[in-house]
Amino acid sequence: MKESPKRILLKLSGEALGENGRLFDQDMILRVGKILSDVAATGAQLGVVIGAGNIWRGRQSQEMDAVTADHMGMLGTVINCLCMRDAVERTGGHAVVFSAIDMPRVCEPYNVQSARQAMAEGKVVFFAGGSGNPFFTTDTAVVLRAAEMQADMLLLAKNVDGVYTADPNKDPNAQLIHDISYAEALERCLRVMDTAAFAMLTEQAIPMVRVFGLAEPENILKVIAGDLRGTVLHP
């Protein structure tokens, strides 16, 4: 019998929440919300980090001050987390948003002990505001939260079904990698996460990272159950 992980951190891209140029696709948002509710209902403890790519991307900033641009991205993650909290609650689950940027009238200030307690209570915990600091990506933020929450597994939902030897959208000979260590992925410059995130993965010895495709939201349940492999990264 497959043993399911007890505590999971999931990274979703902001683009997964939008479609055809829209910031938000309500049908997709509710589908993802229902899946997250279902994951929590299995007894797994679930934390989620969401990017802000549907709202704001750094490359849009042009000549803008870099710190200001990063703050805008952090605020975009708050909007996305509030949206998904609502979706989880509308589909029968319980959820809470913790923000690394204090805004107590909107969401809970981030605190490690409070977030762990909320996960233990069966709530889907959304981590907003990135790491709370500019110049760090949501890749780094999700690894940081995985370490702080003592996660058994980190899931990275992508627009492709795993890690490839090259960009499969550009190279027809690109091959899916099923299993690879953190060190080898970094050495081969495979664009899974940024170097700061990889360094933290290695230092904190996060037990396992699974990279999978989010073509269907149900893939979240499948990868947790072990029915969808994608790519497994490990120390």
Task: List the predicted regions and their residue ranges.
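C-terminal catalytic "cap/lid" subdomain
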Residues: 1-235
